[in-house]
């Protein structure tokens, strides 16, 4: 039975963890870090790169480097934004191109192709999958993936689609704050009520949970899927653009390369200001005009940054109030406040959380790793590796249907424990109505038009009758992933129609399967490319060492071997000029064999010319070499 990994698919960074020996372990990437930037790029050679490599080349390739793709997951152009920034406005902030696809889907452009957000997320998941396989030494095909608690149905489905495209069977979608609570509370024996304040790179969640005897029960959750570290960075970027325009009269917002440099500088300055009082933002050659190159050099203080982002921190407290109210708890009843997400390292955030809850936040967990660890624990629960853990999560948003007058009628209210099922009987609005449309909605607004459409389907074949007579039973079923299926049944005829809300990510089953095949093909290409690079590196190093051997030992190498070695080196250099990996491997092997022959010949020659050594006497006296000191050799 293969390992099931836990994945924190983040806006800024992602992580993968696994249970080993009964303990969760965060897996390092091929580059050696447990934090993998959620960045994907296509470079000038048309190669796809993911993670640290992609982030490192972003300044030189801003238009083909995609980051913060999580903010576009499950979103559509022109949809009601709620607390979120409309897609159109968010797209304008990005140096890469975001376009409108079929059915108002969001697409991002890299190279000469456009991709859906689940496809881009799948590339990040493939990187995590590959790193996990290299670490574990076995194939990884199953995963538990975390999402913000406040993700709606479409965003959750988009995440499942991303997993499928990456070749992963997603056993469970788990809320990020719940995962953090699992990691925090797994070894806790006493009953506690905790608040998980999760401010990540792109999203904010607050969850109130009761912990006790291995049971983790979510009492309420609230949040904002468009509030996170990205927004803090954007405040600094906007300030830098305004200051530079005021000082130099140049608008850097029109320059995509400059924007990418500003983003990296803003993120760096923000991180530094968590530990120091001021930092210098120095960007030489940021732009140029008729007078020549221009530089940017500005001092940013912690107090100035706090003034800039105060509204964002305050914005996070409104969902906290909502979550406390929904849970029926007061801040005094919260035993611990757990901080999750890199943005919670900011002193202002910690102070505001302390002021709100009236207690010092718990800093005993790693805010970057705790979600992935919780996902790995949940994976262990599903596989039977972790016992005596019961997780009771909730739905974040109310689910209902549209009824007469465009009203949204709730069937399952927010913060209902899942899995769950709820039925309600409705009737027709007109005499002899032959069919009804079931319009499935998600959201808290009283009118259907202001909520998100999850799906529509028709129930036909209703027998002619006066309005209000037919009885149509509508049933909502939600599984443990928070995924919804809806059934409508005419109680008079027994006729029923069912819809599972699976295409709300904007991708059909066929599209997901096609993308999966493409992703698999790319994985094969990536493996071949890696194999070629490794073969080239081995060949180049061997040729270099062979050339050095020739230079250093020319007088000691027999003439015929000298000629053979030169010939083999030339063959390797010629093979390296082309793209035939097998030719590179073949010539490398031949050169290696030739080098071994040279080594044998040189050492053989040295031994022939060496004087015979006398045996030491029984008394242990030294022979001819007076510089030799006797001593014992002891293995340690």
UniProtKB/Swiss-Prot annotation:
Region annotation Disordered: where it falls in the sequence: 602-636
One Pfam family recorded for the sequence: HSP70
Induction pattern: By stress conditions e.g. heat shock.
UniProt keyword list: ATP-binding, Chaperone, Nucleotide-binding, Phosphoprotein, Stress response
Identification of the protein by name: Chaperone protein DnaK
InterPro entries for the chain: ATPase_NBD, Chaperone_DnaK, Heat_shock_70_CS, HSP70_C_sf, HSP70_peptide-bd_sf, Hsp_70_fam
Family per similarity comment: Belongs to the heat shock protein 70 family.
Protein species of origin: Dehalococcoides mccartyi (strain CBDB1)
GO molecular function: ATP binding; ATP-dependent protein folding chaperone; unfolded protein binding
Gene this protein is translated from: dnaK
Function: Acts as a chaperone.
Taxonomy of the source species: Bacteria, Bacillati, Chloroflexota, Dehalococcoidia, Dehalococcoidales
Residue list for modification Phosphothreonine: 203
Compositionally biased spans, kind Basic and acidic residues: 618-636
């Amino acid at each position: 039975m293969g390992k099931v990994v836990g994945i924190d698919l983040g806006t800024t960074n992602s992580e993968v963890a696994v249970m080993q020996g009964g303990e969760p372990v965060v897996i390092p990437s091929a580059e050696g870090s447990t934090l993998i930037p959620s960045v994907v790029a296509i470079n000038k050679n048309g190669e796809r790169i993911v993670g640290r490599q992609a982030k490192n080349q972003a300044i030189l390739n801003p238009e083909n480097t995609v980051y913060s793709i999580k903010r576009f997951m499950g979103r559509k152009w022109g949809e009601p934004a709620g607390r979120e920034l409309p897609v159109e406005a968010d797209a304008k902030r990005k140096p890469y191109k975001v376009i409108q696809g079929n059915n108002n889907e969001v697409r991002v452009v890299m190279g000469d192709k456009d991709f859906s957000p689940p496809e881009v997320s799948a590339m990040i998941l493939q990187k995590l999958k590959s790193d996990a396989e290299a670490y574990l030494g076995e194939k990884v095909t199953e995963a538990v993936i975390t999402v913000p608690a406040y993700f709606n149905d479409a965003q959750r489905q988009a995440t499942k689609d991303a997993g499928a495209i990456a070749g992963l069977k997603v056993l469970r979608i788990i809320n990020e704050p719940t995962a953090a609570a699992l990691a925090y509370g797994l070894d806790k024996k006493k009953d506690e009520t905790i608040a998980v304040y999760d401010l990540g790179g792109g999203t904010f969640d607050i969850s109130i949970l009761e912990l006790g005897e291995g049971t983790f029960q979510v009492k309420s959750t609230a949040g904002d899927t468009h509030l996170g570290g990205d927004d803090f960075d954007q405040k600094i970027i906007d300030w830098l653009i305004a200051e530079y325009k005021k000082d130099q009269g140049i608008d850097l917002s029109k320059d995509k390369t400059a924007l990418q440099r500003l983003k990296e500088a803003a993120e760096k300055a923000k991180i530094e200001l968590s530990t120091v009082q001021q930092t210098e933002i120095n960007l030489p050659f940021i732009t140029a005009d008729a007078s020549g190159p221009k530089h940017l050099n500005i001092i940013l203080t912690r107090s100035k940054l706090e003034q800039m982002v105060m509204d964002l921190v305050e914005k996070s407290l409104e969902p906290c109030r909502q979550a406390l109210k929904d849970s029926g708890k007061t801040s005094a009843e919260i035993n611990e406040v757990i901080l999750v997400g890199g943005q919670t390292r900011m002193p202002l955030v910690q102070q505001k959380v302390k002021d709100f809850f009236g207690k010092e936040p718990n800093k005993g967990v790693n805010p970057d790793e705790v979600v992935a660890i919780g996902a790995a624990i949940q994976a262990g629960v599903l596989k039977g590796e972790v016992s005596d853990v019961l997780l009771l999560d909730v739905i974040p948003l109310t689910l209902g249907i549209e009824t007469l007058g465009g009203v949204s009628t709730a069937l399952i209210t927010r913060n209902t424990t899942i899995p769950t099922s709820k039925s309600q009987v409705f009737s027709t609005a007109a005499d002899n109505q032959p069919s009804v449309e079931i319009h499935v909605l998600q959201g808290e607004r009283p009118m259907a038009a202001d909520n998100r459409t999850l799906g529509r389907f028709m129930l036909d074949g209703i027998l002619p009758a006066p309005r209000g007579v037919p009885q149509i039973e509508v049933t909502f079923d939600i599984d443990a992933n928070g995924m919804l299926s809806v059934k409508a049944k005419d109680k008079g005829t027994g006729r029923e129609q069912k819809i599972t809300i699976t295409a709300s990510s904007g991708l059909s089953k066929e599209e997901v399967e096609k993308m999966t095949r493409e992703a698999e093909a790319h994985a094969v290409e990536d493996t071949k490319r890696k194999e070629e690079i490794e073969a080239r590196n081995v060949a180049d190093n061997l040729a270099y060492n062979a050339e050095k051997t020739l230079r250093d030992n020319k007088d000691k190498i027999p003439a015929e071997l000298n000629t053979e070695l030169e010939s083999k080196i030339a063959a390797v250099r010629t093979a390296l000029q082309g793209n035939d990996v097998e030719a590179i491997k073949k010539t490398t092997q031949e050169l290696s064999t030739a080098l071994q022959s040279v080594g044998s010949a040189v050492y053989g020659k040295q031994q022939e010319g060496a004087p015979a050594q006398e045996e030491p006497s029984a008394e242990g006296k030294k022979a001819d070499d007076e510089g030799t000191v006797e001593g014992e050799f002891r293995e340690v």
